[in-house]
Amino acid sequence: MNSLENLILVGVIKSCHGIKGHVILKSFTEPATKILAKNLVNESREDIHIQLISQNAKGELICRFNDITTRNEAENLKGYKIFCLRASLPEPAEDEFYIADLNHLPVLDPNHKEIGKIKNILNFGAGDIIEIEFLDQTTELLPFNKEFFPVITKDYVTLNYQRGV
């Protein structure tokens, strides 16, 4: 079993904050503080215990780990990924989904012909971007919105996009 199988990425440490070992946590939950209600683990599935200190104007959480007390220790956490077990999450409503569940789904054109698969979901701060690997092995990055992806199910997504136009 892949070490990340059945894990959902729910946050990442962006940087340290101050001199007492606090960190800035970018939460992928909505609202951001909902991450703290989850049983959190690292990539090795070891439990993580985080305490909220405050929330900044960008919606990022300023937190502390129980065993991190200095800025130097906190600096080593930059890029540290925080997960929860997929089984610990509630099933999404019929018209909802978890972004992580989209990975590797088939991509269909509007005529329901398979044209590729979702290779990756990215976010550089301006919204989710879907990386599509087409059947000819080329890839394209497209914004994740209803204009490009009018149908999203647990089994496939429909892409409303003509390549090369």
UniProtKB/Swiss-Prot annotation:
- The residues covered by the PRC barrel domain are 94-163
Query: Where located?
Result: Cytoplasm
What does the entry give for GO biological process?
ribosomal small subunit biogenesis; rRNA processing
Q: Which Gene3D superfamilies match?
A: PRC-barrel domain, RimM
Which SUPFAM superfamilies does the entry mention? Answer: PRC-barrel domain, Translation proteins
GO MF = ribosome binding
* Keyword list, A-Z: Chaperone, Cytoplasm, Ribosome biogenesis, rRNA processing
Q: Does the keyword Mitochondrion apply?
A: no
Please name the InterPro entries in this protein's record: PRC-brl_dom, PRC_barrel-like_sf, RimM, RimM_N, RimM_N_sf, Transl_B-barrel_sf
Q: Which GO terms describe its cellular component?
A: cytoplasm; ribosome
> Where is it chiefly localized?
cytoplasm
Keyword Transmembrane helix present in the record's keywords: the answer is no
| Family listed | Belongs to the RimM family.
- Report the PANTHER family cross-referenced here: RIBOSOME MATURATION FACTOR RIMM (PTHR33692:SF1)
What's this protein's function?
An accessory protein needed during the final step in the assembly of 30S ribosomal subunit, possibly for assembly of the head region. Essential for efficient processing of 16S rRNA. May be needed both before and after RbfA during the maturation of 16S rRNA. It has affinity for free ribosomal 30S subunits but not for 70S ribosomes.
| Subunit note | Binds ribosomal protein uS19.
Domain writeup = The PRC barrel domain binds ribosomal protein uS19.
Q: What is this protein called?
A: Ribosome maturation factor RimM
Q: Which organism is it from?
A: Rickettsia akari (strain Hartford)
Its lineage reads:
Bacteria, Pseudomonadati, Pseudomonadota, Alphaproteobacteria, Rickettsiales
